[in-house]
């Protein structure tokens, strides 16, 4: 079976990491054994170093400008693309990504309000035509997101943003999903089993049993 690139998107607490692993196990049942899962930001030594800066800031609590944040995210993404994702796809692997470029459009574009032209220029340069075959957007409200992540020992810089920030992020996600046929919106307020089954049905239709 040819390689595929599938990404999972949404607010923190939506269940992205769990669903990423469930999708991998489901594909295994259909004979797809060459699977690589990734997460952003991170996934290479350089990307993981940048992840710490992005999520927790630099030494001495130096403030991080929103453009600096954006550039670090794209630097981490470029390392992941060139050193992990592209090599895996070239070998015929299916890559399942916990976040990709859509996160930047939603968080830095929608949440931070960064100019869309700058975002598009960076996206085009860094991803260089690499685009997911299919994206699942796990939709939950900011209120539910916050309630789900509050148990974490330490919230990162972005997780500590006010509710209005996540309202903008969610609105941007929903707008982008409405404009692109390969972004499937999933109601992630459902139980984990219901969310999983909904995603499995879409995987069947798109890739596994398209003839039925």
From Swiss-Prot:
Xref: InterPro entries: P-loop_NTPase, Thymidylate_kin-like_dom, Thymidylate_kin_CS, Thymidylate_kinase
Alphabetically ordered keywords of this record: ATP-binding, Kinase, Nucleotide biosynthesis, Nucleotide-binding, Transferase
PROSITE patterns per record: THYMIDYLATE_KINASE
Keyword ATP-binding assigned: yes
EC number: 2.7.4.9
HAMAP family, sorted: Thymidylate_kinase
Protein name: Thymidylate kinase
């Amino acid at each position: 079976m040819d390689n595929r690139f599938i990404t999972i998107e949404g607010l923190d607490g939506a269940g992205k990491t769990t669903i990423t692993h469930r999708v991998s196990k489901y594909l295994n049942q259909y004979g797809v054994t060459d699977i690589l899962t990734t997460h952003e930001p991170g996934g290479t030594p350089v990307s993981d170093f940048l992840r710490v800066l992005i999520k927790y800031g630099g030494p001495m609590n130096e403030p991080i400008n929103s453009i600096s944040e954006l550039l670090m995210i794209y630097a981490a993404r470029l390392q992941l693309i060139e050193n992990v994702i592209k090599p895996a796809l070239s070998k015929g692997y299916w890559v399942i990504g916990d976040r990709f470029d859509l996160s930047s459009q939603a968080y830095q574009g929608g949440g931070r309000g960064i100019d869309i032209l700058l975002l598009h220029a960076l996206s085009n340069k860094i991803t260089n035509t690499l685009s997911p075959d299919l994206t699942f957007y796990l939709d939950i409200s900011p209120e539910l997101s916050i309630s789900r992540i509050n148990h974490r020992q330490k919230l990162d810089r972005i997780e500590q943003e006010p509710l209005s920030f996540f309202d903008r992020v969610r609105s941007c996600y929903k707008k982008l999903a409405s404009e692109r046929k390969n972004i499937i919106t999933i109601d992630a307020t459902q139980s984990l089993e219901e969310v999983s089954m909904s995603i499995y049905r879409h995987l069947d239709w798109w890739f596994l049993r398209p003839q039925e």
